[in-house]
Amino acid sequence: MRQYNPSLRTDQLAQYKTSVHGKKLAGGDQKVAICTDCHTVHDIRPASDPRSSVHPLNVADTCKRCHADAAYMKDYKIPHDQYAGYSASVHRKAMVEGGDLSAPTCTTCHGNHGAAPPGLATVENVCSTCHVFQAQLFDKSPHKKAFADAGMGGCITCHSNHRISHPTDAMVGSGAASVCTNCHSKGDAGFQTAENIAGKFRDLSEAVDSSKNLLERAAHSGMEVSDAELELDAAKDNLTKARVSLHSFSAKRVDEDIDAGMKTAQKTREAGLAALKQREYRRMGLLVSLATILATVGALAFYIRQMEN
């Protein structure tokens, strides 16, 4: 291949032989995917071509031809709902609706030629290629060992694998959507910590929304609050940081980000209230000025009438 493209990789076959597909083919299984199943036969196009069967937008559809076929996959005794789950995931939506071709698809996590199912010990390493800070915090957290001892995967325990939904604050705490209650029950320390963190997320989120509404009212009234609006962005950033810090499973670390955000939100709230108070003061001043002007005009009119008489 060097004469056609010196930089082109030529290890695809070697990788394929290490994959689940390759090993089963070597064992005599003729149903597994081979080169032409993914790349087609005559209509082979580079992966960068949107018409290619291995273009990022089309990879999941290529894999589903086998993996979403219940009858075809019956003998392998593995799930066949991966495509349905992935189609509803935040990753698929980011790719299809958001046009983000760097969003994960099947081969991002499983590999392509060397395709293999990621084990519990390796799945978080796959996720960490994008979610770096979350992975670093989790690696130092007490849940790292607890999950490993229980045979639970790091990321997928809370976020699932194929059907990954957009994370929300409702996932923390003791509500119906909480993932904490899958392991923690009322009365234990973890349950209480989860409730406390959920409450603080809620408090900061409400504080940010309250300040935002005040500043918007002030701005619509013509008051200058652009500096406060910029400061409020810092409070929003603190909320985002707190959500990332949650992966340390350290209430103290989360509190640091929440407390910083609350201080900023309170400061911007006070700026909004001050702006609205100044608006009312200006309105009152305008009313007094108008009243004075009207009184003066009335007095002048009366004086002129008297002069004419």
Annotate the PLM regions.
Residues 1-206, 210, 217-226, 241-252, ...:
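Inter-heme linker and motif-flanking segments adjacent to c-type heme-binding CXXCH motifs
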Residues 214, 230-242, 258-268:
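Long, compositionally biased charged/polar accessory segments in the mid-to-C-terminal portions
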